[in-house]
């Protein structure tokens, strides 16, 4: 695939400074780029690379003023990082466009409806009564249970398992190894010390423009739905339990765990290895730092929380400053105790 710089500038709403007829066929980091590739400069600390890069073109901010001569063409845009993301999306779409049709062997159940321009990879299984939209790509060895609905422009990568009755919106991406709709962790303790399995009869509903990383598990609801709203971005290796609700445009980093029946607000940021207990609510625009433990409802919007149990950022920093001084404080206390004992001894004599 080749694109001229003029074509790329038109896509980005930018302006070419250099040879607009030059062609690029690959994308690379600025420090590793070769002739025929395009890169970008967004972070000023990488500016030195633009003077030595072999890239045929670099996307830069409109007000960029080079301090040295350049051997590469420039594409001037408002936001280089966002523009480069647009390039990556276009490149990926062009690659995916080559995947079309139904590979054998694969299985499609009774009364399944599959839209146009689809791709179904080898050994994929699509259950009965599924409704699959247009431009959907289902890669090899994916499993789609009965009565599943999948919206347009959605990609299901190899080895994904989607249990029966789940619903996926438009432009959803689910990476390899994900399990959507498995049983929630529901067991009733019995008088004899054993546990009785509670049937999980709900489903998972995933909105539009949701991305889910590899090996993440989203459990079905006990009753009703576990819901992932529009725009949510979920990293690899995350556990989302039964009846959880995650609000629009929330992002969750790897190895986080959210316990059952918890509701996460909109535009939250949940960092890696965060643990959240069940049956609580997290307010909109909450930021939770890595490895924090949330054990209570967070009602106030916009807080940043750290530590386990998590507390507000300023309180955590104050507490941590004291924590770091504990060895010194202990030594001072011991010295004061010794002085006190000595003074007591003098008074007694």
Swiss-Prot record:
It comes from the Bacteria. Keywords: Acyltransferase, Lipid A biosynthesis, Lipid biosynthesis, Lipid metabolism, Repeat, Transferase. Pfam families: Hexapep, LpxD. The active site is at residue 242. Gene3D superfamilies: Hexapeptide repeat proteins, MurE/MurF, N-terminal domain. GO terms for molecular function: N-acyltransferase activity. Pathway: Bacterial outer membrane biogenesis; LPS lipid A biosynthesis. GO terms for biological process: lipid A biosynthetic process. GO terms for cellular component: membrane. It is an enzyme of class 2 (transferase). Its EC number is 2.3.1.191. It catalyses: a UDP-3-O-[(3R)-3-hydroxyacyl]-alpha-D-glucosamine + a (3R)-hydroxyacyl-[ACP] = a UDP-2-N,3-O-bis[(3R)-3-hydroxyacyl]-alpha-D-glucosamine + holo-[ACP] + H(+). Homotrimer. Catalyzes the N-acylation of UDP-3-O-acylglucosamine using 3-hydroxyacyl-ACP as the acyl donor. Is involved in the biosynthesis of lipid A, a phosphorylated glycolipid that anchors the lipopolysaccharide to the outer membrane of the cell. Belongs to the transferase hexapeptide repeat family. LpxD subfamily. PANTHER family: UDP-3-O-ACYLGLUCOSAMINE N-ACYLTRANSFERASE, UDP-3-O-ACYLGLUCOSAMINE N-ACYLTRANSFERASE 1, MITOCHONDRIAL-RELATED. This is UDP-3-O-acylglucosamine N-acyltransferase. The lineage of its organism: Bacteria, Pseudomonadati, Bacteroidota, Cytophagia, Cytophagales. The gene is lpxD.
């Amino acid at each position: 695939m080749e694109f001229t710089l003029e074509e790329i500038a038109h896509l980005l709403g930018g302006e070419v400074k250099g040879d607009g007829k030059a062609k690029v066929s690959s994308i690379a980091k600025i420090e590793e780029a070769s002739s025929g590739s395009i890169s970008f400069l967004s972070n000023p600390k990488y500016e030195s690379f633009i003077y030595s890069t072999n890239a045929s073109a670099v996307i830069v901010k409109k007000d960029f003023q080079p301090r040295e001569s350049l051997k590469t063409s420039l594409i001037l845009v408002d936001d280089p990082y966002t523009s480069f993301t647009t390039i990556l999306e276009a490149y990926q779409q062009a690659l995916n466009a080559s995947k079309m049709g139904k590979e054998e062997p694969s299985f499609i159940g009774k009364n399944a409806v599959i839209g146009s321009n689809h791709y179904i990879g080898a050994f994929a299984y699509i259950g009965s009564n599924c409704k699959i939209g247009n431009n959907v790509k289902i890669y090899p060895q994916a499993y789609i249970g009965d009565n599943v609905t999948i919206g347009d422009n959605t990609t299901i990568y190899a080895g994904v398992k989607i249990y029966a009755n789940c619903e996926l919106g438009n432009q959803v991406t689910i990476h390899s190894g994900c399990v959507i709709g498995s049983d929630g962790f529901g067991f009733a303790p019995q008088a004899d010390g054993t546990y009785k399995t509670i049937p999980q009869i709900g489903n998972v509903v995933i909105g539009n423009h949701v991305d889910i990383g590899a090996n993440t598990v989203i459990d079905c609801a006990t009753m009703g739905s576990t819901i992932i709203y529009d725009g949510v971005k979920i990293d690899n290796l995350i556990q989302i339990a039964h009846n959880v609700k995650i609000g629009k445009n929330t992002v969750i980093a790897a190895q986080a765990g959210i316990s059952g029946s918890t509701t996460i607000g909109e535009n939250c940021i949940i960092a890696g290895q965060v643990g959240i207990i069940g049956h609580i609510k997290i307010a909109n625009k909450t930021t939770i730092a890595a490895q924090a433990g949330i054990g209570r409802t967070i009602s106030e919007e916009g807080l940043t929380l750290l530590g386990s149990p998590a507390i507000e950022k300023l309180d955590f920093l104050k507490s941590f400053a004291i924590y770091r001084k504990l060895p010194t404080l202990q030594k001072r206390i011991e010295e004061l105790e010794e002085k006190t004992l000595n003074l007591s001894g003098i008074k007694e004599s």
